[in-house]
């Protein structure tokens, strides 16, 4: 009788793992050590777990349970949220079970982004604790619950509609339920398709408002999964593109509401006149002016022909970037296109106009039609280079569709 013994885990492994589709890869007659075989068993188990999780995600019964809300804040407020040696943010994480991260503190960048992910209850509780932490750090431990504060959430453009609701119905409903005031910026932030949603109120009101906002986004994800997969270009703080303005007032996080945000807000806040149109002479010295008259003699990236299908107005409004960075100057350009091609520029379900916005980072607003006018006005706002690229893309789209229509008209039946 042989005295040699073998562990059950090794001898039974070839028969037990055959149930899994991820079978062990072992050559016949090959000597395999116990450690190698155990590692192979773990590999198979991990693959099986991954396949089960994939199947769970694909099942119709699986519904999203977590939401992701981002808050834009100043660097000094982000440091208050983190707390001394990370004590404050660690306490918020432990008490809410939410995952909280803060973007890197980059030198010269005045803003940071707070990322909060979790269930609706956890996210709302986390934001309630965040605003209370901001008030406590300003010395309002006793009556901080009665002081109003504002936070700025970053919401992708395609999700803002579900928060606003039809004719603002959902926005007003959240205000009534929470006693907070909500302000949705009408335009996208530059170089992204994020919009600002400002919540103003006492900590309890912000807590309740963020809960209903999270719930609204979660319901939208479940009801319209196809719309939720749209690609988002998230706002990234830079030293050239600052959204928030710090007035050095305690207990306030302020930004200019209901207009397109730009970095000149801080620079021009102490000047009597903002965004004055610059004369053609001055424009030619600072940033090249893009007009049908000047484009024929233009250099660099501009082609040597008149831009077809687009009428470009002279004298764009320029917002100078900090430090006189000419390439980062923001311009607001007015152009006109033929009324007949407005639908072509927009595209089905806004596909083409959104593509131009995403590829250039510009904000493009199509004004309402004017009775009796054969042209439609478009307002393009972005960096100088990006706005010119947007104009070229719009012109190119009209030219292609015009040529296709002409070809169909001439082709025999």
From Swiss-Prot:
InterPro entries in alphabetical order: KH_dom, KH_dom_type_1, KH_dom_type_1_sf
Species assigned in the record: Saccharomyces cerevisiae (strain ATCC 204508 / S288c) (Baker's yeast)
One matching Pfam family: KH_1
Name of the protein this chain belongs to: PAB1-binding protein 2
CDD domains: KH-I (cd00105), KH-I_PCBP_rpt1 (cd22438), KH-I_Rnc1_rpt2 (cd22456)
Gene: PBP2
KH domain boundaries: 66-130, 148-213, 330-394
Compartments in which it is found: Nucleus
GO BP annotations, alphabetical order: regulation of gene expression; regulation of RNA metabolic process; telomere maintenance
PANTHER family: KH DOMAIN CONTAINING RNA BINDING PROTEIN
Primary location recorded for the protein, binned into one broad class: nucleus
Gene3D superfamilies the UniProt entry points to: K Homology domain, type 1 (3.30.1370.10)
Bias-annotated ranges (Low complexity): 1-23
Subunit structure: Interacts with PAB1.
Origin: domain of life: Eukaryota
Region called Disordered, residue ranges: 1-36
Keywords associated with the record: Nucleus, Repeat, Ribonucleoprotein, RNA-binding
A molecular function (GO) term: mRNA binding
């Amino acid at each position: 009788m042989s005295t040699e013994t073998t562990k059950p885990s090794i001898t039974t492994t070839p028969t037990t793992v055959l149930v899994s589709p991820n079978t062990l890869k072992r050559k016949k007659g090959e000597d395999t050590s116990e450690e190698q075989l155990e590692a192979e068993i773990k590999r198979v188990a991990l693959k099986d777990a991954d396949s089960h999780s994939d199947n769970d995600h694909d099942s119709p019964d699986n519904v999203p349970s977590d939401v992701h809300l981002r808050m834009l804040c100043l660097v000094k407020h982000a440091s208050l949220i983190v707390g001394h040696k990370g004590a404050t943010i660690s306490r918020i994480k432990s008490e809410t079970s939410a995952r909280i991260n803060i973007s890197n503190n980059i030198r010269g960048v005045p803003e940071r982004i707070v990322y909060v992910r979790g269930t609706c209850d956890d996210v709302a509780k986390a934001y309630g604790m965040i605003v209370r932490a901001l008030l406590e750090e300003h010395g309002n431990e006793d009556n901080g619950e009665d002081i109003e504060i504002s936070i700025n959430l970053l919401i992708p453009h395609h999700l803002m509609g579900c928060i606003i609701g039809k004719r603002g119905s959902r926005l007003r409903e959240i205000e009534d339920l929470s006693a907070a005031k909500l302000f949705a910026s009408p335009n996208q932030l530059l170089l992204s398709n994020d919009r600002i949603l400002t919540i103003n109120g006492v900590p309890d009101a912000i807590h309740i408002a963020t809960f209903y906002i999270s719930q609204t986004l979660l319901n939208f994800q479940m009801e319209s999964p196809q719309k939720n997969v749209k690609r988002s270009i998230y706002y990234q703080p830079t030293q050239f593109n600052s959204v928030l303005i710090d007035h050095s007032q305690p207990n306030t996080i302020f930004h200019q509401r209901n207009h397109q945000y730009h970095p000149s807000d801080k620079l021009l806040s102490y000047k009597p006149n903002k965004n004055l149109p610059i004369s053609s002479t001055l424009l030619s010295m600072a940033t090249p002016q893009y007009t049908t008259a000047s484009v024929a003699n233009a250099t660099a990236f501009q082609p040597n022909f008149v831009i077809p299908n687009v009428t470009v107005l002279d004298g764009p409004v320029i917002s100078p970037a900090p430090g006189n960075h000419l390439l980062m100057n923001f311009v607001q350009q007015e152009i006109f296109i033929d009324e007949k091609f407005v639908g072509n520029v927009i595209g089905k379900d806004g596909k083409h106009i959104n593509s131009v916005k995403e590829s250039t980072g510009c904000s493009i607003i199509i004004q309402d039609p004017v009775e009796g006018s054969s042209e439609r006005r478009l307002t393009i706002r972005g960096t100088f280079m990006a706005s010119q690229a947007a104009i070229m893309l719009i012109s190119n789209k009209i030219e292609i569709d015009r040529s296709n229509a002409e070809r169909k008209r001439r082709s025999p039946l």
